[in-house]
């Protein structure tokens, strides 16, 4: 398997690199170093540094597991709920470009955003991070954001896939949903953004969907995301 950039040039021969890794190194690839880095396999694979970033980067001053309160100074852009009022994908794209410039300066590889959960309840504690209750508007703005960030070579993580519209018990809640509602409300924004902007990665949500956790939901991650939408990025 060959990993290529957006222009078709090969940047990594995955099979060759995997053949050089020990079993221990392969296992350590499944986890991280602290909360924000991937393991570099003793220098064989560049470490990926991630940071939160829907409306500005949050690089920690010091790397401590669970510590998210000591971020370095960075621009705080309007939240998704605020900038969505512009109805302007090009403006959101420019914001993405500005975030990417700050990420490059801090040697950040990937911004964990944008978040496109559909707003179904005003009680959701993270509604400010999401664009809208409208799947159409959300898809247009998310595409602009992803294209803006990735235009400068910084990766993105489209989140949270899927049917995650509450924070209360989000790790264990079970979103029971029929196919029509899933297709008409919760998936359109993801589908448009995945197909048009091709985000570097897609972040699975924590909740269960019809009894199955999103992170191991074959219907969502394989049947729809991989096979139907032809997504080839990381999950």
Regions of interest found by a model, annotated:
Residues 2-235:
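Glycoside hydrolase catalytic-domain context in secreted enzymes
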């Amino acid at each position: 398997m060959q990993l290529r950039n957006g222009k078709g040039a090969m940047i990594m021969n995955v099979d060759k690199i995997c053949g050089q890794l020990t079993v221990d190194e392969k296992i350590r690839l499944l986890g991280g170093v602290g909360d924000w880095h991937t393991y570099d396999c003793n220098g064989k694979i560049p470490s990926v540094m991630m940071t939160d970033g829907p409306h500005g980067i949050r690089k920690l001053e010091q790397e401590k597991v669970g510590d998210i309160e000591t971020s370095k100074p960075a621009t705080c852009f309007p939240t998704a709920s605020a900038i969505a009022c512009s109805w302007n994908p090009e403006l959101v794209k420019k914001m993405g470009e500005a975030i990417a410039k700050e990420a490059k300066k801090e040697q950040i590889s990937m911004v964990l955003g944008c978040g496109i959960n559909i707003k179904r309840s005003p009680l959701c504690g993270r509604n400010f991070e999401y664009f809208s209750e409208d799947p159409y508007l959300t898809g247009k703005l998310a595409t602009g954001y992803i294209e803006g960030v990735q235009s400068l070579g910084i990766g993105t993580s489209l989140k949270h896939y899927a049917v995650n519209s509450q924070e209360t018990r989000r790790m264990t809640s079970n979103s029971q949903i029929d196919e029509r509602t899933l297709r008409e409300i919760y998936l359109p924004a993801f589908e448009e953004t995945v197909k048009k902007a091709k985000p570097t990665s897609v972040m699975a949500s924590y909740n269960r969907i019809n009894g199955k956790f999103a992170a191991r939901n074959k219907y969502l991650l394989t049947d729809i995301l991989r096979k139907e939408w032809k997504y080839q990025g990381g999950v």
